[in-house]
Design a protein with these regions (language model features):
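Gly-Asp-aromatic-enriched flexible segments
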Residues: 432-584
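Membrane-proximal envelope and lipid/glycan-remodeling enzymes
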Residues: 1-440
Length: 584
């Protein structure tokens, strides 16, 4: 963000380059330095669990420009999102052609603006803001899904271009299948309907069966090539063409995961993906943020890690509302058969995603195709009065604001690579208290003081570094003059003379913030054991918290970190910009 560098790698994106290089050698292995912990390990060999399509794309890119090895993540993700926007714009245009109530001016306005709403007012904004190894595969999978939907619906709307649409369908199916398996589900389910519709159209025009078969040979060959490559990819990793994954070979035990899919997860998934809660709102501009997933039945989900989401009812309301109306309309009103089939196929995909053992923002992108088809139905049958168009415009602007700002805020808290100039400007907008704390030139920071010699606890406390020895970093600032601490640790300082208050910023480490039910508390005590401050932290509030406390009359401050509830493996937290401020 803010650097405008198109050719730039992101987290583990180089793993696709590694896979591409090894594919030329006839193997699906990946260098462990490239994939790190996001890997399968089978008989001492390292593999990735992501689809190989981004690696196939890199075969071409690294051949053309080998000097940019490892730098394609951003370009690849941007290309996938751009092609998704193109497909969506064409879907909207095709749907509006069926609606005689829409003026040519309104049709042009919707066709041109809808791709921007999809890109910036849905989870795609989050994917493109962090084009890491996870998001790149998801972006290409979603891209393929949208193009298969376009080809499917155009068989009914533009039957004269059916041969072209069949080729698009076949290529897009391959992109889906080789990017992310679940994104290929709609195309796989629609495939029989698409081929039957094509044969029927050809038969109605009197085409001979042999000629029809010859025309189908190209799309069938493309589909077959994709399937064969995926089966080889399975065999190369697991020794079986039927094994698409094996979580027993993953870096944490499968016993933490439970079953892969369960209907009992649907209520929790619906609440996290679509529910409204005050957790998504903050008191400072832009007033929205992502929130850590909450589960009523946490035993059904991954126990070792949780991520953050923002409700689609906020971040994509322009799509959710008319998409749901269009889907419901198709249940009892006349509707194109392929549109109904597409709704059923994408609904099945969405249900599978919501029955999975993990909920996160990138998976929300797989819910988008269902609402896209519903929106196409809505635009093709409803009279679009000025009020509807105004509502679409307002909700699109609102969704873009929520999606973009929440993605930026998440990137900042995650210390994502953002240009220093942009970081500084955003900090004063999103976190003014913290920006002011970092800039405080009159304070005495604890890292400038020498701890009292007999005060440190046996547990580790690291000035200016976290517990893994890395420099403390917060919102792009590094170093931030703080303490990396583990539960059970404490450290004491002599309070400088003429000190009025102690100020600090508390935050769970990234590892602790993702754990289930992490609950830690920073406490400060004076030389008499009296409580000076108490700042609790838990995994439901993963953002930094600024606090202060008076230390007037005290000569010594002991800072400690402890578990507030039952002890867990996630027990690391940091104090940033910990400082004593003088009397005014």
């Amino acid at each position: 963000l803010g650097s405008w560098e198109i050719l730039r790698g992101h987290y583990l994106g180089v793993a696709y380059d590694s896979l591409a290089a090894n594919l030329l050698k006839g193997t699906a292995e990946v260098d462990i330095e490239a994939i790190q912990m996001e890997r399968y390990e089978v008989d001492g060999k390292i593999f990735m669990y992501f689809g190989p399509f981004p690696a196939l794309l890199r075969l071409v890119l690294n051949f053309v420009a080998p000097g940019y090895y490892g730098s394609w993540s951003r370009l690849s993700t941007l290309l996938a999102v751009f092609l998704s926007a193109v497909a969506f714009g064409r879907l909207i245009s095709s749907a509006l052609m069926l609606n005689q109530s829409v003026s040519s001016r309104a049709r042009a306005w919707l066709t041109l603006t809808a791709p921007f709403a999809l890109t910036l007012g849905t989870p795609l904004a989050f994917l493109v803001s962090m084009p890491n190894i996870f998001h790149e595969a998801m972006a290409w999978g979603l891209c393929g899904t949208l193009w298969t939907l376009l080809a499917t619906l155009n068989l009914s709307i533009h039957p004269e271009t059916r041969a072209h649409n069949m080729r698009i369908f076949a290529i897009s199916f391959g992109v889906c299948l080789l990017s992310r398996l679940t994104t290929a589900i709609p195309a796989a389910l629609l495939m029989p309907f698409v081929f039957i519709r094509y044969v029927r159209l050809e038969t109605l025009e009197g085409r001979a069966p042999l000629r029809v078969a010859r025309k189908l040979s190209v799309p069938c060959s493309l589909i077959l090539i994709s399937c064969v490559f995926q089966l080889w990819y399975n065999y190369a990793r697991f020794g079986s063409v039927y094994a698409f994954r094996d979580l027993t070979k993953y870096f944490f035990p499968k016993t933490h995961l439970g079953s892969d899919f369960s209907l009992f997860r649907l209520p929790d998934a619906l609440i996290n993906y679509f529910g409204l809660s005050d957790r998504y709102f903050v008191s400072l501009p832009p007033f929205v943020r992502m929130a850590t997933t909450l589960y009523q039945r946490p035993e059904l989900f991954v126990q070792v890690w949780r991520e953050q989401v923002i409700s689609l009812s906020l971040s994509a309301c322009w799509l959710i509302i008319p998409g749901l109306v269009g889907a419901l309309y198709s249940l009892w009103r006349p509707c194109q058969s392929l549109a109904r089939a597409a709704l059923a196929a994408t609904l099945f995909q969405a249900l599978l995603v919501m029955m999975y053992f993990f909920v996160c923002q990138r998976y929300a992108a797989e819910l988008v195709p269902f609402f896209v088809v519903g929106l196409c139905v809505f635009l093709s049958v409803f009279r679009l009065h000025r009020a509807w168009l105004t509502t679409l415009a307002v909700t699109s602007a609102f969704s873009i604001l929520v999606s973009v700002t929440s993605a930026i805020r998440f990137n900042m808290v995650s210390n994502a690579p953002i240009s220093p100039t942009l970081y500084e400007r955003l900090n004063w907008l999103f976190f003014p208290q913290i920006a002011a704390a970092i800039a405080d030139s009159k304070a005495t920071f604890v890292t400038d003081l020498v701890p009292l010699p007999d005060s440190s606890s046996p547990a580790q406390t690291s000035p200016d570094r976290d517990l893994f020895g890395r420099p403390l970093q917060l919102l792009g600032y590094s170093p931030v003059k703080g303490l990396g601490m583990v539960a059970g640790s404490s450290i004491s300082y002599e309070i400088p003379t003429d000190t009025a208050e102690f100020h600090a910023i508390a935050m769970l480490s990234e590892r602790s913030a993702g754990c289930n039910e992490t609950s830690l508390v920073f406490e400060g005590h004076d030389e008499n054991g009296a409580l000076v401050f108490r700042q609790p932290l838990n995994s439901n509030t993963p953002e930094p918290v600024a606090f202060s406390a008076s230390v007037v009359g005290a000569s010594r401050l002991t800072i400690s970190l402890r578990h507030e509830t039952e002890k867990s493996l996630c027990e690391i937290a940091n104090l940033y910009a910990a400082r004593f401020t003088p009397k005014r």
